[in-house]
Amino acid sequence: MPMRRRVLAAGVAGLFGAFATGRTAQAVENTENAEAAVPPVRLDLLNLVNLSHVNDPATTNVFPGDPAFTLETIATIPENGYYLQFVREGEHTGTHWGAPGHFNTGQPLADEMDPADLFLPAVKIDIRAKAARNADYAVTIDDLKAWERKHGRIPNDSMVILWTGWDAKWGTPAFPNLDADNRIHQPGFSIPAVKWLIDTGRLGRRGGTGTDTFSPDVGTDETYTVSQLVYQRHRISLEILANLRALPTTGAWVLAGGPIHRHGSGSTATIFGVLPPGVRA
């Protein structure tokens, strides 16, 4: 194997190895010694799982006030020799990620983010039972500590993902769960829980929150305080995630992609869970 490919393979192995042993990716700092520190990993053995919904004008749930999602066929193979659709959507339509400038003036926007900001170790916190009993449930510090007693400490700079069960409601009125006053009822993080994640470094310069709902905020909280806290430095939020059953509780990474617009607030996205060999949901 050429040296460049060996170092790449060793570096990727170091990332996964560091996470699996409770160390952050920053622990593997010396790329010249990475190959000696960890064995190479075959990239073709990584397993990818899709965490994105398919957008369809007939079913895509849109946050109240956001532009409607539309598709228009503007070229066909019989008439034009190729097939093409015109897409109209907001930057946060369907599965997407948000940049810090989405909620905080002066913080990085989508075209100012680093590639590493979009590739993060992930933990999944299953709150489906609590969310089923209370659609406005807010995850507490005690919830996070209880999760850690069972699964180990959340690594620094992680993507902390809530599995609320709302991914199964996608495409139906039960997803926004609006009341008579047009208020959203969806679970999320409490403000103290997010402050604790930040104060303890679990959300650091990088990292963020993920959810299968519209937002990390509880739907009834129109102050967006949780989002304002998360969206700082180079932290992001992954929202309207799909297929979270296929994402392991620990041991996986998430990779977010999508078009980058000038001064973008984020991007519609194809988001993958990246599972190293031996890691299963």
Can you describe what each PLM-predicted range is?
Residues 2-3, 9-22, 28-281:
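Active-/binding-site microenvironments in catalytic and ligand-binding cores
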